[in-house]
Amino acid sequence: MVRVKHLLLIVVVGILFSCRSGEEVSDLPRPYHNLRFEKLPEVWDEALPLGNGLTGALIWQKEGKLRIAIDRADLWDLRSVEEFKSPDHSYQFICDQVLRKKDIAPIQRLIDDRTKYDAAPTKIPAGAIEFNIASLGKVRNVSLDLTSAVCTILWENGAQAHIFVPANEKGGRFFFENLPDTLSPELITPLYEENDAKLDYQPGVNKLTALGYKRGKVEQINPGTLLYQQQGWGDVSYEIALNWKSASGHSLEGEYCVTSKGTWYSEKEGALECMKQTMSNDFNSSLAMHKHWWREYWMKSSISLPDTLLEKQWYLEMYKFAAASRKGAPPICLQAVWTADNGQTPPWRGDFHSDLNTQLSYWAGYTSNHLEESAVFTDWLWKIKENAEAFTRQFYGVEGLNVPCIATLTGEPIGGWSPYSHSPSTAGWLSHHFYLQWKYSMDTDFLKNRAYPWIKEVARYFENISVRDENGERQLPLSTSPEINDNRIDAWFQKTTNYDLANIRLTYTIAREMAEALGLNEEAGYWVRQLSEWPKPAVDESGLMIAPGKAQTESHRHFSHLLSFHPFGLIDVSKGNGNIDLILRSIKNVEMLGTDWWTGYTYAWLANMKARAFEGDDVVRNLHIFIKAFCSPNSFHLNGDQLKAGYSQFTYRPFTLEGNFACAAAIQEMLLQSHTGVIKVFPALSTKWEDVSFRHFRAMGAFLVSASYEGGKIVSITVESEKGGLMKLYNPFTDKITERKMVTGETITFTNKFPMGK
């Protein structure tokens, strides 16, 4: 009966959705975009990922058992760093040690060394559910359907399992059918206490036992219901409730809820109460609502490429983006809702790394028209604002706003290599995302109440922390460029680096634009004057330098010195020959230095730069390397060259997500660019591509753009105005910029027949 109800539900849902236009339906991810394996993955970082921003799951096989690894985004060990209570924990102390004493060892003892033996602060896992599937025999195939975000496992004996993390619930659902015998789940706790498990160690991790927790107890509430309660550090604790029922021994239906206490995102109710609410909807009802959410998500935008590898990867990345970033939940950290399921803390503590990682993780959200998901990042930045301001006063000794570059869920500093964990300009790069959220949405309330107040405080910080040099120009007392020179004393620069300078110049540039948009002309003028007091970027024959007197002379994973070009666009090909030459020299230099010390995200970032330089073939080449060499079979970015094919000397495999979303962003940059204020469609296509299209990509100014490219030519462009305003389009049918004052809701289509639009 359950099976019949399930089939009827699918038919009804299909009929309901078929009322949509055929064009819209065809835009959904297609079967060939799905993840599909012939057997269950046997390594956690190759598992099939499910998630809803708050809770996540990894589906894999461990020691012969089907395993659902459970995660929740706000589960953190937030113990304070005792060393940071020292009066020496200050920017002034670092300046004294570097500039006057020429001795970085005391800094390393204070900020860096503790991370080698202190496991916390860190992201922590929740637990797992396991099923003994030995009686089910051989798996025929395993798939993750992107359209519905449902994992399906088929066995050769006809048994099936369907698993999903509901879009609007706080846990997961599973349904087995055609079982040859009774099957029961087991609730597994993390390895918080020592046992005989063999661990595959990754860099920068600790055993979970190092956290010092007593393992929580699993209690049977009644037949078919289990409750696991785990105390974390301080006030943080969590619960997992698991419920299941069988029908005639041949099917199994169940659900679980995971709740927390003591975090910004915690519920009032515990897991059992949460599950009672969840159980008001059965599996099929929950599945219907879940599919509807994902259907609406996929309707936001779509692409069609002749390169099926890139097309599939884009859909995989946009799937992970929705699974990892959701309104009301924390933003994407290094692994998001897929914390390591191996008895260890996650790579690099699973923290919020803002010298690159968190920023790249949101690049793909804007053009893809997923502003609700991208707003999660700025929502969190606003939430940590008070803590960041307190950190700025304590560490830098000035008023204003900077953010710990390596931070916890609450924005507190974790430490690590001091030049980057305590970078003096992190908030400048983070300000860019307030700018992007505003420009793509044109949300005046957001601009007035969040974006401008945030950026104004960052600008005030830069003014307060700066000093004057012998020429009267402003400089930072001490500067860095992630992650140049690793953790040595020469990782600190006496002249302001191009990285720090890009963050500073961007902050004043967008502060002026925001002030003008709000009619605050006096404040806008002040930001213009402040900007004029800082130096221009350092350049030489190789292009953009790291800092005055320091060129980029060796292979490196981080293009921090090129930030003013990408993503900021302060230097851009649209600004003339001088900029074009500088950009091309800079890109050529990093390529000539080789890829020995690149990671996967380096290739993805370079692909974005190549797109900005309109070099589409190079975009494709770099993204193919990224996907084939640096991603696991489930599409997770593993940093190192997994093929060991010479693409990098790094051949390790710590999983982080930023490279994935940078890859998606590069594909989007090939199809649409609007960072200059002028909309350009298909600016960086491969010369080998004949037929390309995209639907409802978002341009700055809150314009939705759709375009088709057939037989090697642009055939149509449609622009919809969401908020009204002046639209500027590079018109390929006239080879000129077309300007049109649009009203809210207006749509204009440009074709060969109607080159000026209709």
Name the predicted role of every residue range.
Residues 436-442, 446-452, 456-468, 524-552, ...:
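Non-catalytic carbohydrate-binding regions of carbohydrate-active enzymes
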